[in-house]
Regions:
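N-terminal leader/targeting and accessory segments in enzymes
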Residues: 1-96
Length: 96
């Protein structure tokens, strides 16, 4: 039996990260699971765009949104400008 993904509200994520919603038309209230791996994103997930030595998660935002991620947690707003007006997507910017 597969374990259900934890659910988090947008408000819980904002409190935990100190982030702010920067998307213009988001109606998302909850996320069903969190992923840092774009290959494993499922519909309803919050994708955390980590920047590492070899990869920058910001480069995979389009891919995870095509997989129906409900939101993305980002640092670099410039890399997600094309998605700021996307409906039903919460884009949350954090300092670090």
């Amino acid at each position: 039996m597969k374990k259900a993904a934890p659910k988090f509200s947008v408000e819980e994520v904002l409190r935990a990260t100190g982030g702010e919603v920067i998307s213009k038309s988001s109606t998302v209230k909850r996320f069903c699971g969190i992923s840092t791996d774009s290959r494993a994103v499922a519909p309803g997930n919050l994708f955390v765009a980590l920047k590492g030595e070899n990869f920058d998660g910001h480069d995979f935002v389009r891919e995870v949104l095509e997989k129906e991620a409900a939101g993305v947690l980002i640092q670099d707003e410039e890399k997600v400008v094309p998605f700021l007006t996307r409906e039903n997507t919460a884009i949350i910017r954090v300092a670090d």
